[in-house]
C-alpha cells in the first residue's frame, strides 16, 4: 500500500491512509473496479476518513451516511481483506501496516511524502460495499493504483467536493498533525472517532525514543517528575507518554522477572533484569562466617578478639616478630585477604580473612573466630596463610554451615592467641565449651593454622602454659620446623608455627612462651604436667593434657602440641602418635556431635594431631584438649561443615572429612593439615584421604578413629612437621567430648590421623595433593 500510495499523486490520500489505516487487511488490489455505489447500498466514505480514499460500505452499511454513489468509481478493489472494522472506523489505512496506526514512523513519513494536501481527496466518498458485496472502495489517493485521482471527484458529491463531515475533518486534522508530529515524533497519539467516540490510537515510538527510554529505564525504573519532563522534552514526547511508557515497561519487566523477586529493579530480562538481578542478587557477603557462633563473633570481628589476644598474643607473638601484632596484622591480613597475605597476617588472612577474601568457610570461621587466631597465626600461620588461602576457597562450602567450626578452626589460632593470656584460656575454653563450634573454632584456628601448627598463634594463645613445652617443642620444632620451614616456605605455617610457637610460645626465642608457660600454667593448670608434655616427647601427652585443659582454652596446648609436632614431628612419636591417634580417633566417634561439643574440637585437634601426627600430629594429639581449639580453629570449620569448613580452606578440604570427621569420628581425614600429606590418606575419612597421607597414617584409615584406642597421651608426637592445621578435626570428634579431657591424646592421635587424611577435603583436594606431593610442610599451605 505504501508503495502504491507513494506512487499515487493523490496526496492526502496516502497520508490519510497512513495515519488512519488501522487495518492491515486493507489490501488494495491494484485492479481497478468500478462498482455502482448505489448498488452497494450505503456507500461509505471510508476514504474520507482514512484519507485513504477507500470507502468500504457494506450494502447495509452507509458509511457516514454518504449517499450511494451511482457513478462508478474506479477503485482498487479492496478485497474483503479489508477489515470490516475499517468500515466501522470509517477510515482505512491503506498502508499494509494498517494494524499499527502510526506505529512506524516510516509509514508516517511515507504518507507525508504523498501530497499531504490531498486529505480532502482522501476523504472522497467511496461507496463500496466492503462486505464483499462489492467493494466499491473509493480509494482516492493511495489506494487506487493507477486509479486516477480525478476519479474521486466523480463521486456524487464531487470527489473533491465531497462534503466533509465533522468526523472527516477531525480525522484529517489529527492525521495531519500526527503526520507532522510523527516525523519528528513517532509517538503520535491520534484520536480517531469510532462510533462517534474518540479513540486514542496506539502511540508509536521511534527507535531513538525507545532507545533513550530503555536506557533511562535501565538506570531508573521510576522517574521523578523533573526527570520525566526532561525526557519528554528531549524525546519530543508528552509527559504522559513517558509516564505510561515507564509504567508499561515496569510491568513488562515484572513479568520477565517474576521468577526473580527483583522485578522492579531489574529492567529487562535482557537489560534491566539481568543487570538488576545481578546487582540485586545478594552478593556474597564477604563474611560468610558472620553466622559463626556468638563465641566466635569476636573473631568475626577479628579485631576484637585479635585485640584481646593481642596483648597476650602480642606478648607471645612479639618474639614472633612483626607478625606479632598478629591481631592487627592478622586482621589486616585477614581483611585484606587470605591468599594474598604474604605476611603472617596473610597467613592468618586465610584463616581470618577468609571471611572477606575467602568468603568461604574461612570467612565465617575466620571472621568469627579467626581474628585472634589469625593474629596468632599471623606469625605462626603464614604457612597456614598459604594453606589457608587456598584452603579458604575450600572453606566456602562448609564454611557457612560450619561457621562455628570454622570459627573454632580459626579460633584455634585465635584462641591460642588468646590463650597467651589467661583470659584467652578462659575464653578459649569457654569458646570451646560454650559454643562447641564457636569455641572450637577459635582454638582450631590456631591449630588449623597450625598447620602452622604449633607455632601458630594458637600455640601461644593455646598453650600459654603449654608453651614452655612449646619452647622445647619449638626448639625441637625450630630445629625440625626450621628445617621444615626452610624446607617449605609453604610450610610457613610451620614456620610461622614454629616461629610463632617458638616466638610465640616461649619457644626458644620467646619470652612469650614464658608467659605462655604462665598461661600454660593457667591453662595447663588442669594438667600441670603438660609442661613435661610440652617437652617434645611428652608434648603429646602434654598436649593431651593441654588438650584437656585447652580444649576449652582452645589450644594453647594445641599450638604447642602442634609446634612440637611440627618440631619433633616426633616421628617416633608420630608412630606412637599414630597409634595414639588411632586410639584417639576411635574415641572421637562423635564426629559431628563431638564437633558440637568439645569433641568436635577435639576432633579438630584430633585431626590436627593426626595431621600433626603426620607432620606434627603429636602436638595436636597432645593438644587434643586444646586441640578443640586447634581443631576448631582449623578443623572447626571443617568440622562444622565437613567439607566446607575449610576455614583454613585447605584444611577445610578435609571438610568432607569434616563432616565425616564429625561423623566419622572426627572425619579424621580432615586434616586440614594438608600438611599431613605424609600420612597416607588411609585415614578412614573418605574425603580426607587426600590429606591424610600422614605417615602416621597408620591410624589413617579412619582417622585414627579406630586408632582412637591408641595412645591417648602419647599421641602427641606425630611430628609431621607440616602442619597441624590439617589437624584432625575429624579425628577429634569423639575425642572431643571426652577426648577433651582425655582425648587430648587420644583424640589428638585420632585427630592427627584424621586430620592428616582430611587435610584437604573437597576444596583443597588439589592442595592436599600438592601438599601430599610436596610434604606435610607443604600442607601448611593447605
UniProtKB/Swiss-Prot annotation:
Protein known as: Homeotic protein proboscipedia
Residue interval(s) of motif Antp-type hexapeptide: 164-169
One BP annotation, GO: specification of segmental identity, maxillary segment
GO CC entries: nucleus
Subcellular location: Nucleus
Species per Swiss-Prot/TrEMBL record: Drosophila melanogaster
Function: Sequence-specific transcription factor which is part of a developmental regulatory system that provides cells with specific positional identities on the anterior-posterior axis. Controls development of mouthparts, and labial and maxillary palps.
Stretch list, region Disordered: 1-23, 153-195, 251-336, 358-380, 439-493, 547-586
The family this protein is said to belong to: Belongs to the Antp homeobox family. Proboscipedia subfamily.
Keywords, ordered alphabetically: Developmental protein, DNA-binding, Homeobox, Nucleus
Coiled coil stretches, renumbered: none
